[in-house]
Each structure stands twice: as structure tokens, then as C-alpha cells.
Amino acid sequence: MEVEQVLNGLMWKHANEPEFLQAVKEVLISIQDVYNQHPEFEKAKIIERLTEPERVIMFRVPWTDDDGDVHVNTGYRVQFNSAIGPYKGGLRFHPSVNLSIMKFLGFEQTFKNALTTLPMGGAKGGSDFSIRGRSDAEVMRFCQSFMQELYHYIGPDEDVPAGDIGVGGREIGFLFGQYKKLTQQFQGVLTGKGMEYGGSILRPEATGFGALYFVNQMLQTRDIDIKGKTVVVSGFGNVAWGAVKKATLLGAKVITISGPDGYIYDPEGISGEKNEYMLELRASGEDICAPYADEFKGSKFIPGRKPWEQKADIYLTCATQNELNGDDADLILSHKPLCIAEVSNMGCTAEAVEKFVNARQLFAPGKAVNAGGVATSGLEMTQNSMRLHWSSDEVDEKLHYIMHSIHGQCTKYGTQKDGYIDYVKGANVAGFMKVANAMMAQGIV
């Protein structure tokens, strides 16, 4: 069956799952040429199997608030593919969470993990619970109830969740504590843990650090030095924090961060104590970035707008999926940028991606450029299994090597006849080939 026929069937079958279909369509269009060169893939129905999760777990999560009132949320764990290793992927606590988003993230995670060179399958999970405005005690009770069901399906050699939006160090601690109590085992069943109980150094910064290593590699393909370049960043969570920190260390100047309320423009650059203040804003639970302008003179808060209107050399999406649309892409292209990177998962709409690629713009897709987070999670798994702890320099060196390797895979499969590197195609084909070959070797399962 041709790729187009498979895609049409999926669009009919999953018509109510737009995010999942968007992710699947991007991958299938990218890999159709290489897929057609392998008739054995079609015979084994690789695409049909690859686009269907191995397991979808949905469950209720009852919990009580501080007033004693009962609430019920929905929990998810989509175990998408385990062909190259145990399931691996984050947990997201946010009101927007639904099955379509969990499936899209699990599908993307499968290819992202394949690119890291580490033995990790793809999964994603979470709940439509919001931590905003909730006390520590309420968050703890929710996490304990969530783990009460999830623990049946995870383990260090089965499925190893991590954090994501709404799930930081506090939540991972509560989840791990409940898992330990239920199983009476101290295992590396979660990553993103605190340093005191099996966590890896640099894990909070890893996604942002890895993204800048990848962006730097992209710029070097055109003999461009990142030093002195201006950077527009969206978001103000861990991903943005890590990206700002590493961009500054590499000699670039970050001039924006953003939140649901608008964005901050700081022409003097966001670094040092300004960058650390971002974490205070995020920890406040208010989900707004406006207070930054009150804290630091010379900066300006622009309410209700996106940071893409600012002219810069490099643009990084670090907030959430589909935050950058076609109109935003036109605006960015009018600034004549050097590079755009999708540091958030599927941070750009399909229309935006198409515009960047058609313009022959240096564009990094999320599954490649933001793989540093899960790569460092994989390094945490390794440290837990070996019962040892690596230094900051050791972890950073391994992360740098992994991102360099991912960039190499993208250029191998994405370089076009005219010399343009289509990183979207390169990442998709590289990830697909590894997973497909593993599935072929393991039979029809």
C-alpha cells in the first residue's frame, strides 16, 4: 500500500485527533521515497504498525483538595513503540492534555529517541490536571493517586517516564516516592529525579543546552559564528531557561522570553540573574512573565503579543506545540533570520514548517533539536543502572557528542542536490530507518 493510501486511511480513522495526524503526516511525507525503495517494509506493514501505539492506557485519577472536595481527572500513558528499547517519554500535567496530544507526543518521541543513539523506545503520558493555583499538598495527593494506577505499567526495563510541561522536580519527587512505597523498590523508574536520590546533573538544562549545540552545528554548515548573534526565545520554563543559559555561554544575546500573557523584550540581553529570575517566575505558579519588566529596568513587557515580531538572527520556540503559525513564519522570514529551531515539541504548525523549508531557511525540527532532554534522561538511566554518578563535564561532553551525532544523521539523510539541508526530512528518515529495521528484525509483533 502506498504511503498516501495509508495516510488517507489514518485521516479517516483518527479524524478527531488533529495533533496526532499532523505529526504522522509530516513523517510519512518525509519518508515516502525511502519507504518505496524497501518493498519488505510494505510487506511487513511497517507504517501501519508504526502509526498504531502498542498500548494505550487511560485511567481515572481521583484526589481531594485542601477543602476536602473530591476531584477526578483523566490519566494517560501511551506506550507507542518499544522496538529499540524500553518505553521512554515524559509526563505532562496540563488542562490541554487529551488522547490526540498524548499520541502525537508518543509518536514523535519514538523517532526522537531513535536519533539519540541510545536504546529507548517511545512513549508519553500525563493528565488534564493543572498545577496552577494548587498547594504542594494538593499536588502531592494528585501525584500519589496518579502513580497508584501508573505503577502497574512502568519499570526500569519496561517504561521510564520523565517530566514535561507541569511536571518538574517537585512532581517527579512525589511520583517517585509513591512508586517506592507501592513497590518497596528503589529503581531508576523515573528520570528528572533530584540529585539526592539518583538524578543526573544538567538534566534541567539539557533540552536547552542540546538545542544550542544543534543550532551551532547548523550555523557552522554555512560558516556562521554564533558569537554576537541575537536570539528570540519563547516560553519561560526549564527549556527556555536552558536555551538562554547556553546561548549566553556561546556568546549570543537573548532578547526575549514569553508567557501566556505576552512577552518580555530586553535589548540589553537576558543572562545571569535575569535568567535565574525566570525560574522564580515559573515556580510562582502564576504562569505570567510580566513581573520581569518590573524587576529589571530597561526591559519592556508587551502584553498579548508574540516575540516573533522582534528582529533577530535566531528564533527558538521553547513554549508549547503549534505556538508558531504560518503568519508568524511570514513575519520571521521578513526579518531575514539565520536559523529557526523548534525547541518545543512540534512548536510550529505544518504551514509554518512548509514556509521555512520552501524558503530554504535553516530550520531544525523538534525531534532533532530538542532531543537533548531525553538524551540526558537516557544518561540518567545509565547512571542508575550502573549505580554511579557522572560529573557535569562528563554529562555535558556526552550530550554534546549525542547532539553532534543527531546533526550528522540529519545531514546524511536530508542533504538535497542543491546542497540545502532539509533537517525535517533528514530527522524523519534517520529515525524511521532505525525503528523500521529493528521492527523487521523482531518479526510481526
What are these regions (language model features)?
Residues 1, 15, 19-22, 26, ...:
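Conserved active-site and cofactor/substrate-binding residues in soluble primary-metabolism enzymes
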Residues 2-23, 218, 333-445:
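Adenosine-phosphate binding glycine-rich loop
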Residues 21, 37-46, 117, 154-163, ...:
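Flexible, glycine/charged-enriched surface loops at secondary-structure junctions
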Residues 40-69:
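Structured beta-strand/loop patches that form or line metal/cofactor-binding pockets in enzymes
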Residues 94, 113-227:
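Glycine/serine-rich phosphate-binding loop and adjoining beta1-alpha1 elements at the start
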Residues 191-194, 199-311:
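Glycine-rich phosphate/diphosphate-binding loop of Rossmann-like nucleotide-binding domains
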Residues 262-363, 368:
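Rossmann-like adenosine-cofactor binding region
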